[in-house]
Amino acid sequence: MSISPAIDQLVENLKRLPGVGQKSAQRMAFHLLERDRGGASRLAESLQSAVEKVGHCECCRTLTEEPLCRICSNPMRRENGVLCIVETPADVLAIEQTSQFQGRYFVLMGHLSPLDGIGPADIGLDELERQLQSEPVEEIVLATNPTVEGDATAHYIADIAAQLNINTTRIAHGVPVGGELGYVDQTTLGHAFSGRKQFSR
């Protein structure tokens, strides 16, 4: 049953968001229209503004309003010599929030997936190779997701790095802080054991 074509269209577009199904989209739509029309207008304006102003960094390909993002335009970050490879701009934000990494990034905007027709050129690996050949990089940190596709992508990049004699490391995967072993899947637990390190007191 349809109440309004405009509401139907709003619900359909809200369903484009990750993890949002029909029911969630309907709840959001009705909340905005019933209780928060001012918020709905601000949401529409900010979304329109972001779509118009935000593009990709010319160097690392993350999202930014400038030709170079704030990380790539920072001389100290560029001279660090460490390049972290991630799948999405959200990964950059997640790593930056830890304050543990002081190098720069290269954002793939995805991962290798031959079954979906996504090859090396589709995620910018040709561009990455050109950068590695032209700019001094001492270490590559592979921070792709711990999935079959993420691991395949990491291996592909490691092969490129090996040909250029660049040291390659992979972020550790294991048991999350606060997690209970009984709820951890076998693959994650296996990674945790193979990546164990000396206990420091």
From Swiss-Prot:
InterPro entries: DNA_Rcmb_RecR, Rcmb_RecR, Rcmb_RecR_Znf, TOPRIM_dom, TOPRIM_RecR. Gene3D superfamilies: 3.40.1360.10, 6.10.250.240, RecR Domain 1. Keywords: DNA damage, DNA recombination, DNA repair, Metal-binding, Zinc, Zinc-finger. GO terms for biological process: DNA recombination; DNA repair. A zinc finger (C4-type) spans 57-72. GO terms for molecular function: DNA binding; zinc ion binding. Residues 81-176 form the Toprim domain. HAMAP family: RecR. Belongs to the RecR family. May play a role in DNA repair. It seems to be involved in an RecBC-independent recombinational process of DNA repair. It may act with RecF and RecO. This is Recombination protein RecR. The lineage of its organism: Bacteria, Pseudomonadati, Pseudomonadota, Gammaproteobacteria, Alteromonadales.
